[in-house]
């Protein structure tokens, strides 16, 4: 056998070995922006199909819906959805992602927020808060209209804030619900807030998110996901305190974009039926 033939044969074997490894590496999730985006793509594909079989779960993956432990095999992830829009933020410091999903299907519309935690090349936790018809101020069509008109993309470096500043801005906003100290919130102008589907913006440079903020409400159990690149910070929290009988405030999601240290956009979802609303002047949900 000629040497050239042997060399050619060995080359083919090496190519056959290298290509699958390269493809696999390109598909692998990790705690990098690229790796987390790949995890999100897999999650969106699974939610679209209602099929979790191809998600790379860690052993004993943690799963919650509306802040309560749930069976991932029976959860909303198994419901096929026609997703109209999704957008995500990436926290490379804590290896977490947050994804907002909007579904305007007339039969079963949803607006959802999902947190994932990545552990090396596996999804270690998934937590979803979902809202649908009958929930607090729900209007998926309006939410889609307003969310898609906003810029949540990478921010110019000179407009970005530090991780600490982003968390402080979110805390100041949420603290105002209890203390009523609105002057401590870094309000930006304009600032637009989408709450379930209700919108505070009027297209004016003076638009404010300082509209309809109640007082005397303790927003508890705050957990943060921070993306300095997009100037975004997400908070899963409870609208109201835990109670001695094991109850807790309504499961709540707040997503903020901060430009030049000031609030630009606020998105809010609350897993609370409108029929459970007390209807008092302070917007306090039933406990």
Functional labels for PLM-detected ranges:
Residues 1-10:
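Bacterial N-terminal signal peptides that target proteins for export
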Residues 9-20:
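Bacterial N-terminal signal peptides
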Residues 24-287:
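C-terminal and inter-domain tail/linker signature
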């Amino acid at each position: 056998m000629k040497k050239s033939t042997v060399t050619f044969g060995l080359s083919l074997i090496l190519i056959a070995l290298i290509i699958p490894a390269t493809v696999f590496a390109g598909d692998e999730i990790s705690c990098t922006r690229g790796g987390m985006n790949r995890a999100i793509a897999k999650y969106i594909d699974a939610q679209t199909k209602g099929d979790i079989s191809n998600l790379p779960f860690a052993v004993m993956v943690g799963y919650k819906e509306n802040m309560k432990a749930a069976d991932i095999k029976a959860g909303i992830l198994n419901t096929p959805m026609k997703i109209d829009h999704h957008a995500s933020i990436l926290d490379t410091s804590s290896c977490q992602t947050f994804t907002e999903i909007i579904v305007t299907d007339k039969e079963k519309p949803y607006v959802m927020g999902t947190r994932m935690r990545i552990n090396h090349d596996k999804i270690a936790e998934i937590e979803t808060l979902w809202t649908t018809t009958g929930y607090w101020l729900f209007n998926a069509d309006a939410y889609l209209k307003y969310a898609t008109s906003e810029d949540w993309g990478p921010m110019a470096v000179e407009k970005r804030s530090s991780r600490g500043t982003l968390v402080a801005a979110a805390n100041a906003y949420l603290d105002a619900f209890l203390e009523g100290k609105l002057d401590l919130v870094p309000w930006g102008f304009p600032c637009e807030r989408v709450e379930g589907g209700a919108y505070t913006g009027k297209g004016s440079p003076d638009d404010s998110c300082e509209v309809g903020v109640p007082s005397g409400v303790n927003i508890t159990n705050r957990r943060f996901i921070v993306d300095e690149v997009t100037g975004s910070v997400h908070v899963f929290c409870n609208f109201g305190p835990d109670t001695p009988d094991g109850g807790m405030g309504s499961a709540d999601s707040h997503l903020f974009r901060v430009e030049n240290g000031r609030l630009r956009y606020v998105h809010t979802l609350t897993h609370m039926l409108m029929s459970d609303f007390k209807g008092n002047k302070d917007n306090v949900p039933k406990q």
